[in-house]
Amino acid sequence: MKKSVKSLSLLLALIFILGLATGCSQESTAKVEPKTLKVGVTAGPHAEVMDVVKKIAEKDGLKIEVIEFNDYIQPNVALNQGDIDVNSFQHKPYLDNIIKDRSYDLVTVGNTVIFPMGIYTSKLKNIADLQTGATVAIPNDPTNGGRALLLLEKIGVIKLKPGVGIKAAVTDIIENPKKIVIKELDAAQIPRSLADMDIAAINTNYAITAGLVPTKDAIFMEDSNSPYTNIVVVRAKDKENPAVQKLIKAYHSAEVKTFIQEHFKGSVIAAW
């Protein structure tokens, strides 16, 4: 009889302990919040597209907090320091240059869009009207500056040293028949300086933010074969993070591609 009572007591104690454990487990599970990613973007099209991605990702249990930046420098600084988890604003040549200069441990996890760079003017009807001694604005960061110089070469304004490619710098100009004066400015500031320039090479995201319509206002644009595809970037240790993979899945959805096609009408091109 004593054995039976003792066995029953042990059984009841075990059931009680298991009940507590189950309750704690359920309580713990109930407190788990959906994963949130802080995603850094530049104002304009990158932010607009990410707002669409955000809504799609939320259906998959992923919350995205969009953090807007006003230049090309801080999004990588913030990502490297851990202030944000992801950024989406730059192309691969620009990232490669930043990694080389600053030794950031950052990697690409997916393609996003292409923003064709354009040549803009408030003074000329076409590039043939460009006068000797004209003032030309290009971005002052090495990658986009090189991109702008290649564009100027393509329209016949300058000639560069053979083989310099995307690493072209102003010092690589070997022919400048119109003796143009090149002003290297912060990419985000160039649209505001357009009235003071004869022509300017402007990144599409900043052109749109300034109220320009690339397909209408640019007198020349890069084509879809541009090597400057924009990318999603994370710290190397987060490359396989499931939340990051959910972000890429949402970005590469049919809904996002349709939004890009209908909203930007060719000024921005989906690159996946």
Show where each model-derived region lies.
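Periplasmic-binding protein-like
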Residues: N144-E153, Y251-A271
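Short helix-initiation/N-cap motifs at beta->coil->alpha
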Residues: I67-V77, V164-R192
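Beta->alpha turn/N-cap motifs
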Residues: G44, N70-Y72, G82, V86-D96, ...
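Short, well-ordered beta-strand elements
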Residues: V32-G44, L62-E68, T135-V136
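Short, low-complexity disordered leader/linker segments with a strong preference
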Residues: M1-T36, W272
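A bilobed periplasmic-binding-protein/Venus flytrap-type ligand-binding module shared by bacterial periplasmic
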Residues: P116-I127, T229-N241
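A conserved helix-loop-strand patch within extracytoplasmic ligand-binding domains
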Residues: V109-I158, K257
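Ligand-binding "clamshell"
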Residues: N97-V109, S122-L124, D196, A201, ...
